[in-house]
Amino acid sequence: PRIYTYGHRNPQGITFRPGTNQPYVAENGPWHTDEVTALVAGGNSGWDPRPNIGGRGACPDNYCGYSPNQMGAVDPKVRSAFMPMTDTKTYPNAMKPAWTNDGLSQGLFAGTFLTGPQWKTWNGRMIIGFAGIGIHGTPVGNRLDVLDIAADGLSATRTTVSLPMPAARFPSLVQGPEGNL
């Protein structure tokens, strides 16, 4: 298809899983859940910020993507249910994310898969960086997560890497020719 997938909100980057070449997208959610999703040709990512669906009423400018506002101290789980990143109620066949940020966005950036024996148990796992927005007690920057994505691409476990350095953002993660990140 000319359009590989649709229904995305804010993709930050696409990377390909070594060995399978399965594409994965890292995507920012609207004041809540960030996601990593395996892409499927013709797949719908399930983002639909229209008013008057899924229990929502009218929204400013007919766009519900920022409602309810995170600054309003709305519980992240309540906010996520109101405007889900992947709306499986409206789109039951939407591509399911392998990993989400548990309803509290921290500004996910693009990721890459780590390759090479120097990565030991992390070889073949995806690493993602965060901007860190510092709301509701979240840290500002200085965070990398390593995701062990299941072979079917439908689930993942996370290891958060703490770095001994001042807060920093990681908008682009790339392995160099020698395998260093």
Predicted regions and their residues:
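Beta-propeller domain segments
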Residues: 1-160, 168, 178
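Short, flexible active-site loop motifs that bind/organize anionic cofactors or intermediates
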Residues: 163
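Blade-level signature of beta-propeller repeat domains, shared across WD40, Kelch, NHL, RCC1
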Residues: 174-181
